[in-house]
Amino acid sequence: MKTLDVHALHEGIQHTIEKLDKQKQQLEKLEKSVEHLAGMKDALKGKGGDAIRTFYEECHKPFLLFFGIFIDEYKKVLKQTQHAISSVESNSHGMIAEAFLSHDARHGVKHAREVTEQLTDAVNRQTSAIDHIVSLPTVNDSFFRMETEQAERLISDTLNKLFQFDGQQTQALEAAKSDFQTMKKYIDQLETMYTGPKIEITGYKSGSILKSQEEENINQIFGAINPQMKQADDSPMEMMLKKLAENEKSKVDSVVKTGDSKKVSKNIIVINGKVYNTSEHREHIKTDFSNAEVKQVVYNDTLYNVYISGNDMKLEPVVSLSDIKVDENGYVKILETAVELTGVYDLFKAATGRDPVSGEKVTGKDRVVASINSVPFAKIAKLEKLIDINKLINNGKKAKKASEVKNVAKDKGKIANDVSGSANKINSDLIKKYARDIEQRTGRELPKNQIDKLKEALRNKEYKKMSPIETAKHRTKFDKVKNKVIKEWEENTGQKWPVYKENVVSEKTGKIIRKKGDKYDAHHIIENTFGGEHEWWNMHPAKFPNEHQAGIHGTGSPANELFKGGKKK
Protein backbone atom coordinates (compact mmCIF):
# COMPACT_ATOMS: atom_id res chain seq x y z
CA MET A 1 0.00 0.00 0.00
CA LYS A 2 1.31 3.42 -0.97
CA THR A 3 1.62 6.31 1.48
CA LEU A 4 2.62 9.90 0.72
CA ASP A 5 3.98 11.89 3.65
CA VAL A 6 4.59 15.28 2.05
CA HIS A 7 6.80 16.75 4.77
CA ALA A 8 8.93 13.63 5.18
CA LEU A 9 9.37 13.23 1.41
CA HIS A 10 10.43 16.87 0.98
CA GLU A 11 12.96 16.53 3.78
CA GLY A 12 14.31 13.26 2.41
CA ILE A 13 14.73 14.67 -1.11
CA GLN A 14 16.43 17.82 0.17
CA HIS A 15 18.81 15.77 2.30
CA THR A 16 19.70 13.60 -0.71
CA ILE A 17 20.31 16.66 -2.91
CA GLU A 18 22.67 18.13 -0.31
CA LYS A 19 24.62 14.85 -0.17
CA LEU A 20 24.83 14.79 -3.97
CA ASP A 21 26.18 18.36 -3.98
CA LYS A 22 28.95 17.33 -1.58
CA GLN A 23 29.75 14.28 -3.68
CA LYS A 24 29.93 16.45 -6.79
CA GLN A 25 32.47 18.75 -5.11
CA GLN A 26 34.59 15.77 -4.07
CA LEU A 27 34.24 14.30 -7.55
CA GLU A 28 35.53 17.49 -9.20
CA LYS A 29 38.62 17.42 -6.99
CA LEU A 30 39.19 13.77 -7.86
CA GLU A 31 38.80 14.51 -11.58
CA LYS A 32 41.53 17.15 -11.36
CA SER A 33 43.82 14.70 -9.57
CA VAL A 34 43.28 12.00 -12.21
CA GLU A 35 43.75 14.58 -14.98
CA HIS A 36 47.02 15.65 -13.39
CA LEU A 37 48.22 12.05 -13.01
CA ALA A 38 47.33 11.16 -16.60
CA GLY A 39 49.30 14.17 -17.82
CA MET A 40 52.52 13.39 -15.93
CA LYS A 41 54.50 12.50 -19.05
CA ASP A 42 57.82 13.60 -17.60
CA ALA A 43 57.41 11.67 -14.34
CA LEU A 44 55.83 8.53 -15.78
CA LYS A 45 57.99 7.46 -18.72
CA GLY A 46 58.57 4.26 -20.61
CA LYS A 47 56.11 1.46 -21.26
CA GLY A 48 55.21 1.13 -17.58
CA GLY A 49 54.63 4.86 -17.19
CA ASP A 50 52.58 5.00 -20.38
CA ALA A 51 50.49 2.05 -19.17
CA ILE A 52 49.81 3.73 -15.82
CA ARG A 53 48.77 7.01 -17.45
CA THR A 54 46.63 5.16 -20.00
CA PHE A 55 45.01 3.14 -17.22
CA TYR A 56 43.87 6.26 -15.39
CA GLU A 57 42.94 8.00 -18.64
CA GLU A 58 40.78 5.13 -19.91
CA CYS A 59 39.58 3.42 -16.73
CA HIS A 60 39.08 6.26 -14.28
CA LYS A 61 38.44 9.45 -16.21
CA PRO A 62 35.38 8.22 -18.20
CA PHE A 63 33.92 6.72 -15.03
CA LEU A 64 34.28 10.00 -13.13
CA LEU A 65 32.72 11.93 -16.01
CA PHE A 66 29.85 9.44 -16.14
CA PHE A 67 29.40 9.66 -12.36
CA GLY A 68 29.18 13.45 -12.65
CA ILE A 69 26.44 13.16 -15.27
CA PHE A 70 24.64 10.65 -13.05
CA ILE A 71 24.65 13.09 -10.11
CA ASP A 72 23.33 15.95 -12.27
CA GLU A 73 20.55 13.85 -13.78
CA TYR A 74 19.59 12.31 -10.43
CA LYS A 75 19.32 15.77 -8.86
CA LYS A 76 17.17 16.94 -11.75
CA VAL A 77 14.75 14.04 -11.23
CA LEU A 78 14.57 14.69 -7.48
CA LYS A 79 13.77 18.37 -8.02
CA GLN A 80 11.07 17.45 -10.52
CA THR A 81 9.61 15.10 -7.92
CA GLN A 82 9.56 17.90 -5.35
CA HIS A 83 7.69 20.11 -7.79
CA ALA A 84 5.22 17.34 -8.68
CA ILE A 85 4.23 16.67 -5.05
CA SER A 86 2.01 19.76 -4.94
CA SER A 87 -0.13 18.37 -7.77
CA VAL A 88 -1.07 15.48 -5.48
CA GLU A 89 -1.18 17.20 -2.08
CA SER A 90 -0.82 20.98 -1.70
CA ASN A 91 -0.59 20.91 2.12
CA SER A 92 3.08 20.88 3.14
CA HIS A 93 2.23 18.60 6.08
CA GLY A 94 -0.38 16.53 4.27
CA MET A 95 -0.58 12.76 4.30
CA ILE A 96 -2.20 10.41 1.79
CA ALA A 97 -2.52 6.74 2.76
CA GLU A 98 -3.82 4.29 0.18
CA ALA A 99 -4.89 1.84 2.90
CA PHE A 100 -7.03 4.45 4.67
CA LEU A 101 -8.67 5.77 1.49
CA SER A 102 -9.27 2.34 -0.06
CA HIS A 103 -10.72 0.75 3.06
CA ASP A 104 -11.61 3.03 5.98
CA ALA A 105 -12.74 6.06 3.97
CA ARG A 106 -14.65 4.11 1.31
CA HIS A 107 -16.29 1.80 3.83
CA GLY A 108 -17.18 4.79 6.01
CA VAL A 109 -18.86 6.64 3.15
CA LYS A 110 -20.66 3.49 2.05
CA HIS A 111 -21.83 2.76 5.60
CA ALA A 112 -23.07 6.33 6.06
CA ARG A 113 -25.03 6.16 2.81
CA GLU A 114 -26.59 2.81 3.73
CA VAL A 115 -27.58 3.99 7.24
CA THR A 116 -29.05 7.18 5.84
CA GLU A 117 -31.03 5.26 3.24
CA GLN A 118 -32.38 2.90 5.92
CA LEU A 119 -33.40 5.78 8.21
CA THR A 120 -35.00 7.63 5.31
CA ASP A 121 -37.02 4.57 4.31
CA ALA A 122 -38.11 3.97 7.92
CA VAL A 123 -39.25 7.56 8.42
CA ASN A 124 -41.11 7.61 5.10
CA ARG A 125 -42.87 4.35 5.97
CA GLN A 126 -44.04 5.80 9.28
CA THR A 127 -45.31 9.02 7.71
CA SER A 128 -47.13 7.13 4.98
CA ALA A 129 -48.89 5.07 7.67
CA ILE A 130 -50.56 8.17 9.10
CA ASP A 131 -51.03 10.19 5.93
CA HIS A 132 -54.81 9.57 6.18
CA ILE A 133 -54.76 11.44 9.48
CA VAL A 134 -52.28 14.16 8.72
CA SER A 135 -50.41 15.04 5.56
CA LEU A 136 -46.61 15.06 6.07
CA PRO A 137 -43.91 15.55 3.46
CA THR A 138 -41.60 12.60 2.71
CA VAL A 139 -37.92 12.75 3.62
CA ASN A 140 -35.65 13.30 0.57
CA ASP A 141 -32.05 12.08 0.93
CA SER A 142 -30.94 12.97 -2.63
CA PHE A 143 -28.69 15.80 -1.39
CA PHE A 144 -26.90 13.43 0.97
CA ARG A 145 -26.51 10.92 -1.84
CA MET A 146 -24.85 13.59 -3.99
CA GLU A 147 -22.46 14.37 -1.16
CA THR A 148 -21.50 10.71 -0.71
CA GLU A 149 -20.99 10.28 -4.46
CA GLN A 150 -18.77 13.36 -4.49
CA ALA A 151 -16.80 11.93 -1.56
CA GLU A 152 -16.31 8.65 -3.44
CA ARG A 153 -15.13 10.52 -6.54
CA LEU A 154 -12.71 12.53 -4.42
CA ILE A 155 -11.32 9.32 -2.94
CA SER A 156 -10.91 7.79 -6.41
CA ASP A 157 -9.31 10.95 -7.83
CA THR A 158 -6.89 11.18 -4.91
CA LEU A 159 -5.89 7.54 -5.31
CA ASN A 160 -5.46 7.97 -9.07
CA LYS A 161 -3.22 11.00 -8.49
CA LEU A 162 -1.22 9.02 -5.95
CA PHE A 163 -0.79 6.07 -8.35
CA GLN A 164 0.06 8.39 -11.25
CA PHE A 165 2.59 10.30 -9.16
CA ASP A 166 4.19 7.07 -7.98
CA GLY A 167 4.33 5.62 -11.50
CA GLN A 168 5.72 8.77 -13.13
CA GLN A 169 8.41 9.33 -10.52
CA THR A 170 9.38 5.66 -10.54
CA GLN A 171 9.70 5.81 -14.34
CA ALA A 172 11.75 9.00 -14.08
CA LEU A 173 14.18 7.18 -11.80
CA GLU A 174 14.63 4.24 -14.19
CA ALA A 175 17.41 5.95 -16.15
CA ALA A 176 19.27 6.80 -12.94
CA LYS A 177 18.75 3.23 -11.71
CA SER A 178 20.13 1.85 -14.98
CA ASP A 179 23.17 4.17 -14.84
CA PHE A 180 23.76 3.16 -11.22
CA GLN A 181 23.72 -0.52 -12.21
CA THR A 182 26.18 0.25 -15.03
CA MET A 183 28.58 1.89 -12.58
CA LYS A 184 28.22 -1.01 -10.14
CA LYS A 185 28.98 -3.54 -12.89
CA TYR A 186 31.99 -1.49 -13.93
CA ILE A 187 33.35 -1.38 -10.38
CA ASP A 188 32.82 -5.13 -10.10
CA GLN A 189 34.70 -5.58 -13.37
CA LEU A 190 37.63 -3.48 -12.13
CA GLU A 191 37.72 -5.43 -8.89
CA THR A 192 37.88 -8.67 -10.87
CA MET A 193 40.63 -7.39 -13.15
CA TYR A 194 42.79 -5.46 -10.72
CA THR A 195 42.19 -6.87 -7.24
CA GLY A 196 44.54 -9.47 -5.86
CA PRO A 197 47.88 -9.98 -4.14
CA LYS A 198 49.59 -8.12 -6.98
CA ILE A 199 47.95 -5.42 -9.12
CA GLU A 200 49.69 -5.08 -12.50
CA ILE A 201 48.42 -1.81 -13.96
CA THR A 202 51.87 -1.24 -15.46
CA GLY A 203 50.92 -3.88 -18.03
CA TYR A 204 47.58 -2.33 -18.90
CA LYS A 205 46.84 -2.35 -22.64
CA SER A 206 44.88 0.47 -24.20
CA GLY A 207 41.28 -0.45 -24.96
CA SER A 208 41.18 -3.63 -22.86
CA ILE A 209 38.70 -2.08 -20.42
CA LEU A 210 36.10 -2.08 -23.21
CA LYS A 211 35.98 -5.85 -23.11
CA SER A 212 33.15 -7.33 -21.05
CA GLN A 213 33.65 -10.67 -19.33
CA GLU A 214 31.24 -12.35 -21.73
CA GLU A 215 33.24 -11.08 -24.70
CA GLU A 216 36.67 -12.16 -23.49
CA ASN A 217 36.60 -15.35 -25.57
CA ILE A 218 35.38 -13.66 -28.74
CA ASN A 219 38.16 -13.18 -31.27
CA GLN A 220 37.56 -9.82 -32.92
CA ILE A 221 39.43 -8.02 -35.62
CA PHE A 222 41.85 -5.24 -34.54
CA GLY A 223 41.54 -6.33 -30.88
CA ALA A 224 38.67 -3.91 -30.13
CA ILE A 225 34.97 -4.17 -29.46
CA ASN A 226 33.00 -4.38 -32.68
CA PRO A 227 30.74 -1.32 -32.78
CA GLN A 228 28.03 -3.39 -34.47
CA MET A 229 27.47 -5.63 -31.43
CA LYS A 230 24.16 -4.27 -30.16
CA GLN A 231 23.24 -6.61 -27.36
CA ALA A 232 22.30 -6.51 -23.72
CA ASP A 233 25.72 -7.60 -22.49
CA ASP A 234 27.78 -4.68 -23.81
CA SER A 235 30.68 -3.89 -21.50
CA PRO A 236 29.94 -1.30 -18.76
CA MET A 237 32.64 1.02 -20.12
CA GLU A 238 31.13 0.88 -23.60
CA MET A 239 27.73 1.83 -22.20
CA MET A 240 29.28 4.73 -20.29
CA LEU A 241 31.16 5.95 -23.36
CA LYS A 242 27.98 5.89 -25.42
CA LYS A 243 26.21 8.07 -22.88
CA LEU A 244 29.19 10.42 -22.66
CA ALA A 245 29.10 10.76 -26.44
CA GLU A 246 25.39 11.61 -26.33
CA ASN A 247 26.02 14.12 -23.56
CA GLU A 248 28.78 15.70 -25.63
CA LYS A 249 26.34 16.09 -28.52
CA SER A 250 23.83 17.85 -26.25
CA LYS A 251 26.56 20.29 -25.28
CA VAL A 252 27.26 20.88 -28.96
CA ASP A 253 23.56 21.56 -29.53
CA SER A 254 23.61 24.21 -26.80
CA VAL A 255 26.72 25.79 -28.32
CA VAL A 256 24.97 26.01 -31.67
CA LYS A 257 22.11 27.97 -30.11
CA THR A 258 24.33 30.61 -28.51
CA GLY A 259 24.26 34.05 -30.06
CA ASP A 260 27.73 35.21 -29.09
CA SER A 261 29.85 36.23 -32.04
CA LYS A 262 33.58 35.78 -31.46
CA LYS A 263 36.39 37.04 -33.63
CA VAL A 264 39.00 34.45 -34.49
CA SER A 265 42.67 35.22 -34.78
CA LYS A 266 44.14 34.29 -38.13
CA ASN A 267 47.45 33.48 -36.49
CA ILE A 268 46.63 29.98 -35.26
CA ILE A 269 47.26 26.46 -36.42
CA VAL A 270 45.65 23.24 -35.20
CA ILE A 271 47.90 20.30 -34.35
CA ASN A 272 46.23 17.20 -32.93
CA GLY A 273 43.32 19.26 -31.68
CA LYS A 274 45.58 21.82 -29.93
CA VAL A 275 45.82 25.46 -30.96
CA TYR A 276 49.16 27.21 -31.35
CA ASN A 277 49.54 30.94 -31.86
CA THR A 278 51.74 31.68 -34.86
CA SER A 279 51.66 35.46 -34.54
CA GLU A 280 55.30 35.46 -33.46
CA HIS A 281 56.37 33.21 -36.30
CA ARG A 282 57.31 34.03 -39.86
CA GLU A 283 54.93 35.63 -42.28
CA HIS A 284 53.42 33.51 -45.03
CA ILE A 285 55.34 33.47 -48.24
CA LYS A 286 53.39 35.30 -50.92
CA THR A 287 51.46 32.49 -52.53
CA ASP A 288 48.58 32.30 -54.97
CA PHE A 289 45.83 30.40 -53.15
CA SER A 290 43.26 30.69 -55.94
CA ASN A 291 43.58 26.98 -56.79
CA ALA A 292 44.50 25.80 -53.29
CA GLU A 293 43.03 22.78 -51.56
CA VAL A 294 40.52 23.95 -48.95
CA LYS A 295 39.87 22.36 -45.55
CA GLN A 296 37.46 23.60 -42.87
CA VAL A 297 37.96 24.24 -39.16
CA VAL A 298 35.50 25.26 -36.43
CA TYR A 299 37.05 27.43 -33.73
CA ASN A 300 34.86 28.97 -31.01
CA ASP A 301 31.82 30.33 -32.85
CA THR A 302 33.39 30.77 -36.27
CA LEU A 303 33.93 28.56 -39.30
CA TYR A 304 37.08 29.30 -41.28
CA ASN A 305 38.95 27.80 -44.22
CA VAL A 306 42.47 26.38 -44.36
CA TYR A 307 44.04 26.94 -47.78
CA ILE A 308 46.87 24.56 -48.74
CA SER A 309 48.96 25.35 -51.79
CA GLY A 310 52.27 23.61 -52.37
CA ASN A 311 54.23 23.95 -49.13
CA ASP A 312 52.28 26.90 -47.72
CA MET A 313 49.03 27.28 -45.80
CA LYS A 314 46.86 30.16 -44.65
CA LEU A 315 43.74 30.52 -42.48
CA GLU A 316 40.73 32.67 -43.30
CA PRO A 317 37.56 33.18 -41.18
CA VAL A 318 34.38 32.48 -43.15
CA VAL A 319 31.28 33.14 -41.05
CA SER A 320 30.05 33.28 -37.46
CA LEU A 321 28.06 30.09 -36.91
CA SER A 322 25.66 31.83 -34.54
CA ASP A 323 24.47 33.87 -37.52
CA ILE A 324 23.42 30.89 -39.64
CA LYS A 325 20.86 28.13 -39.25
CA VAL A 326 22.34 24.71 -38.71
CA ASP A 327 21.24 21.17 -38.05
CA GLU A 328 22.74 17.75 -37.39
CA ASN A 329 23.91 17.49 -41.00
CA GLY A 330 25.82 20.76 -40.79
CA TYR A 331 27.54 22.39 -37.87
CA VAL A 332 26.87 19.62 -35.38
CA LYS A 333 28.47 17.11 -37.72
CA ILE A 334 31.55 19.31 -38.04
CA LEU A 335 31.91 19.59 -34.28
CA GLU A 336 31.60 15.87 -33.77
CA THR A 337 34.14 14.76 -36.35
CA ALA A 338 37.92 14.53 -36.21
CA VAL A 339 39.95 16.77 -33.93
CA GLU A 340 43.31 16.07 -35.54
CA LEU A 341 45.18 17.56 -38.48
CA THR A 342 46.22 14.13 -39.71
CA GLY A 343 49.83 14.02 -40.83
CA VAL A 344 50.99 17.26 -39.19
CA TYR A 345 51.02 15.67 -35.74
CA ASP A 346 53.04 12.63 -36.84
CA LEU A 347 55.32 14.74 -39.04
CA PHE A 348 56.01 17.17 -36.21
CA LYS A 349 56.75 14.28 -33.88
CA ALA A 350 59.03 12.62 -36.43
CA ALA A 351 60.88 15.82 -37.28
CA THR A 352 61.55 16.91 -33.68
CA GLY A 353 61.44 13.70 -31.72
CA ARG A 354 58.95 15.30 -29.34
CA ASP A 355 55.23 15.43 -28.81
CA PRO A 356 54.01 18.87 -29.89
CA VAL A 357 51.65 19.00 -26.91
CA SER A 358 54.58 18.68 -24.51
CA GLY A 359 56.59 21.36 -26.30
CA GLU A 360 56.57 25.06 -25.44
CA LYS A 361 52.98 26.12 -25.01
CA VAL A 362 51.79 29.40 -26.44
CA THR A 363 48.74 31.41 -25.27
CA GLY A 364 45.92 29.00 -24.40
CA LYS A 365 42.77 29.06 -26.52
CA ASP A 366 39.23 27.96 -25.95
CA ARG A 367 37.91 24.53 -26.82
CA VAL A 368 38.64 23.61 -30.42
CA VAL A 369 36.96 20.95 -32.48
CA ALA A 370 38.33 20.59 -36.01
CA SER A 371 37.15 18.71 -39.05
CA ILE A 372 40.30 18.83 -41.13
CA ASN A 373 40.91 15.79 -43.30
CA SER A 374 44.36 14.36 -43.88
CA VAL A 375 46.95 16.62 -45.47
CA PRO A 376 49.36 14.89 -47.89
CA PHE A 377 52.85 14.59 -46.46
CA ALA A 378 54.39 16.14 -49.55
CA LYS A 379 52.43 19.34 -48.97
CA ILE A 380 53.56 19.80 -45.37
CA ALA A 381 57.10 18.50 -45.55
CA LYS A 382 58.35 22.09 -45.24
CA LEU A 383 56.18 23.03 -42.30
CA GLU A 384 58.95 25.25 -40.95
CA LYS A 385 58.01 27.82 -43.61
CA LEU A 386 54.84 28.46 -41.61
CA ILE A 387 56.03 27.69 -38.08
CA ASP A 388 59.41 28.12 -36.48
CA ILE A 389 59.58 24.64 -34.93
CA ASN A 390 62.54 25.64 -32.75
CA LYS A 391 60.31 27.90 -30.69
CA LEU A 392 58.08 24.96 -29.80
CA ILE A 393 60.91 22.77 -28.44
CA ASN A 394 61.75 23.08 -24.75
CA ASN A 395 65.47 22.40 -25.00
CA GLY A 396 66.01 24.64 -28.01
CA LYS A 397 67.39 21.90 -30.24
CA LYS A 398 67.11 22.63 -33.91
CA ALA A 399 64.62 20.75 -36.00
CA LYS A 400 65.82 18.29 -38.56
CA LYS A 401 66.62 19.63 -41.98
CA ALA A 402 63.92 19.80 -44.59
CA SER A 403 65.48 16.91 -46.47
CA GLU A 404 65.36 14.74 -43.35
CA VAL A 405 61.76 15.73 -42.81
CA LYS A 406 60.96 14.69 -46.36
CA ASN A 407 62.56 11.29 -45.77
CA VAL A 408 60.58 10.82 -42.57
CA ALA A 409 57.43 11.88 -44.37
CA LYS A 410 58.19 9.38 -47.10
CA ASP A 411 58.54 6.58 -44.53
CA LYS A 412 55.34 7.73 -42.87
CA GLY A 413 53.62 7.60 -46.21
CA LYS A 414 54.74 4.00 -46.66
CA ILE A 415 53.10 3.05 -43.38
CA ALA A 416 49.98 4.91 -44.40
CA ASN A 417 49.88 2.86 -47.59
CA ASP A 418 49.89 -0.33 -45.52
CA VAL A 419 46.85 0.91 -43.61
CA SER A 420 44.85 2.46 -46.41
CA GLY A 421 45.57 -0.22 -48.97
CA SER A 422 46.95 2.16 -51.57
CA ALA A 423 49.70 -0.26 -52.62
CA ASN A 424 48.93 -1.94 -55.95
CA LYS A 425 49.23 -5.44 -54.52
CA ILE A 426 46.69 -4.75 -51.79
CA ASN A 427 44.31 -2.94 -54.12
CA SER A 428 44.19 -5.67 -56.74
CA ASP A 429 44.63 -8.87 -54.78
CA LEU A 430 44.00 -8.46 -51.08
CA ILE A 431 40.81 -6.42 -51.41
CA LYS A 432 39.40 -9.10 -53.71
CA LYS A 433 40.44 -11.76 -51.23
CA TYR A 434 38.73 -9.89 -48.40
CA ALA A 435 35.57 -9.41 -50.49
CA ARG A 436 35.46 -13.09 -51.45
CA ASP A 437 35.93 -14.07 -47.80
CA ILE A 438 32.92 -11.94 -46.82
CA GLU A 439 30.86 -13.46 -49.63
CA GLN A 440 31.84 -17.00 -48.68
CA ARG A 441 31.08 -16.55 -44.98
CA THR A 442 27.73 -14.82 -45.51
CA GLY A 443 26.57 -16.50 -48.73
CA ARG A 444 25.84 -13.09 -50.28
CA GLU A 445 27.76 -11.47 -53.12
CA LEU A 446 29.20 -7.97 -53.21
CA PRO A 447 28.16 -6.34 -56.49
CA LYS A 448 30.78 -4.76 -58.72
CA ASN A 449 29.64 -1.18 -58.01
CA GLN A 450 30.18 -1.80 -54.30
CA ILE A 451 33.64 -3.32 -54.77
CA ASP A 452 34.65 -0.37 -56.98
CA LYS A 453 33.59 2.06 -54.26
CA LEU A 454 35.58 0.14 -51.66
CA LYS A 455 38.70 0.10 -53.84
CA GLU A 456 38.41 3.84 -54.39
CA ALA A 457 38.10 4.52 -50.67
CA LEU A 458 41.05 2.30 -49.74
CA ARG A 459 43.23 3.89 -52.42
CA ASN A 460 42.49 7.48 -51.51
CA LYS A 461 42.03 7.53 -47.74
CA GLU A 462 44.25 6.62 -44.82
CA TYR A 463 42.42 4.69 -42.11
CA LYS A 464 43.78 4.81 -38.57
CA LYS A 465 42.51 3.06 -35.48
CA MET A 466 40.53 5.45 -33.30
CA SER A 467 40.51 5.86 -29.53
CA PRO A 468 37.70 4.23 -27.50
CA ILE A 469 35.85 7.55 -27.10
CA GLU A 470 36.19 8.35 -30.82
CA THR A 471 34.93 4.84 -31.64
CA ALA A 472 31.94 5.29 -29.34
CA LYS A 473 31.06 8.59 -31.00
CA HIS A 474 31.46 7.03 -34.44
CA ARG A 475 29.18 4.18 -33.42
CA THR A 476 26.56 6.59 -32.05
CA LYS A 477 26.50 8.39 -35.40
CA PHE A 478 25.92 5.12 -37.22
CA ASP A 479 23.02 4.19 -34.95
CA LYS A 480 21.26 7.36 -36.13
CA VAL A 481 21.67 6.65 -39.86
CA LYS A 482 21.66 2.85 -39.86
CA ASN A 483 18.15 2.39 -41.30
CA LYS A 484 18.81 5.03 -43.96
CA VAL A 485 22.10 3.38 -44.98
CA ILE A 486 20.47 -0.07 -45.16
CA LYS A 487 17.74 1.34 -47.40
CA GLU A 488 20.37 2.88 -49.70
CA TRP A 489 22.20 -0.46 -49.75
CA GLU A 490 19.03 -2.19 -50.94
CA GLU A 491 18.49 0.45 -53.64
CA ASN A 492 22.06 0.28 -54.96
CA THR A 493 22.57 -3.50 -54.77
CA GLY A 494 19.09 -4.63 -55.78
CA GLN A 495 19.07 -7.00 -52.79
CA LYS A 496 16.81 -7.24 -49.76
CA TRP A 497 18.45 -6.88 -46.35
CA PRO A 498 17.83 -10.22 -44.55
CA VAL A 499 16.14 -10.59 -41.16
CA TYR A 500 16.38 -13.21 -38.42
CA LYS A 501 13.82 -15.98 -38.82
CA GLU A 502 14.02 -16.94 -35.15
CA ASN A 503 15.34 -15.55 -31.88
CA VAL A 504 19.08 -15.75 -31.24
CA VAL A 505 19.76 -16.74 -27.62
CA SER A 506 23.07 -16.29 -25.79
CA GLU A 507 24.54 -19.65 -24.81
CA LYS A 508 26.06 -18.12 -21.69
CA THR A 509 23.28 -15.92 -20.30
CA GLY A 510 20.18 -17.41 -21.92
CA LYS A 511 19.09 -13.91 -22.93
CA ILE A 512 17.60 -13.10 -26.32
CA ILE A 513 20.24 -11.00 -28.08
CA ARG A 514 18.61 -10.90 -31.53
CA LYS A 515 14.84 -11.09 -31.97
CA LYS A 516 12.90 -12.75 -34.76
CA GLY A 517 12.27 -10.14 -37.45
CA ASP A 518 15.31 -8.00 -36.52
CA LYS A 519 17.61 -7.05 -39.39
CA TYR A 520 20.92 -8.89 -39.72
CA ASP A 521 23.95 -7.10 -38.29
CA ALA A 522 25.35 -4.34 -40.50
CA HIS A 523 29.03 -5.17 -40.96
CA HIS A 524 31.35 -2.28 -41.79
CA ILE A 525 33.65 -3.70 -44.46
CA ILE A 526 36.16 -0.94 -43.68
CA GLU A 527 35.98 -1.30 -39.92
CA ASN A 528 34.01 1.11 -37.74
CA THR A 529 36.91 1.02 -35.29
CA PHE A 530 39.08 2.50 -38.04
CA GLY A 531 36.58 5.21 -39.00
CA GLY A 532 34.94 3.25 -41.81
CA GLU A 533 32.29 5.28 -43.62
CA HIS A 534 28.61 4.97 -42.75
CA GLU A 535 27.77 4.55 -46.43
CA TRP A 536 25.87 1.85 -48.31
CA TRP A 537 28.96 0.65 -50.15
CA ASN A 538 30.73 -0.04 -46.84
CA MET A 539 27.92 -2.25 -45.50
CA HIS A 540 27.24 -5.97 -45.74
CA PRO A 541 24.59 -8.01 -43.89
CA ALA A 542 26.02 -10.64 -41.55
CA LYS A 543 24.18 -13.04 -39.27
CA PHE A 544 25.18 -13.06 -35.62
CA PRO A 545 27.30 -14.81 -34.47
CA ASN A 546 28.51 -17.34 -37.05
CA GLU A 547 28.73 -14.98 -40.03
CA HIS A 548 29.72 -11.89 -38.08
CA GLN A 549 31.77 -12.09 -34.86
CA ALA A 550 32.92 -15.68 -35.36
CA GLY A 551 33.02 -15.33 -39.14
CA ILE A 552 34.19 -12.11 -40.75
CA HIS A 553 35.90 -11.07 -37.51
CA GLY A 554 37.24 -14.54 -36.79
CA THR A 555 40.78 -15.86 -36.97
CA GLY A 556 42.19 -16.00 -40.48
CA SER A 557 40.13 -13.17 -41.91
CA PRO A 558 41.96 -11.34 -44.74
CA ALA A 559 40.96 -8.11 -42.99
CA ASN A 560 43.80 -8.70 -40.54
CA GLU A 561 46.28 -8.56 -43.40
CA LEU A 562 44.47 -5.78 -45.25
CA PHE A 563 44.72 -3.42 -42.29
CA LYS A 564 48.11 -4.67 -41.17
CA GLY A 565 50.13 -1.90 -39.52
CA GLY A 566 47.11 0.23 -38.84
CA LYS A 567 46.92 -0.32 -35.12
CA LYS A 568 48.22 2.35 -32.84
CA LYS A 569 50.95 1.25 -30.52
Curated annotation (Swiss-Prot):
Residues 548-569 are annotated as: Disordered. Keywords: Coiled coil, Hydrolase, Nuclease, Secreted, Toxin. InterPro entries: HNH_nuc, LXG_dom, PT-TG_dom. The keyword Nuclease applies. Transmembrane segments: none annotated. It is found in: Secreted. Disruption phenotype: Deletion of the yxiB-yxiC-yxiD-yxxD-yxxE operon has no visible growth phenotype, however it is out-competed by wild-type cells. PROSITE patterns: LXG (PS51756). Induction: Expressed on rich and minimal solid media likely in early stationary phase; dependent on DegSU. Not expressed in liquid LB, but only under conditions that promote biofilm formation. GO terms for molecular function: nuclease activity; toxin activity. Residues 1-235 form the LXG domain. Residues 8-91 form a coiled coil. GO terms for cellular component: extracellular region. Toxic component of one of 6 LXG toxin-immunity modules in this strain. They promote kin selection, mediate competition in biofilms, and drive spatial segregation of different strains, indicating that LXG toxins may help avoid warfare between strains in biofilms. Mediates intercellular competition during biofilm formation; disruption of the operon disadvantages the bacteria, but overexpression of the cognate immunity protein restores growth in competition with wild-type. This is Toxin YxiD. It comes from Bacillus subtilis (strain 168).
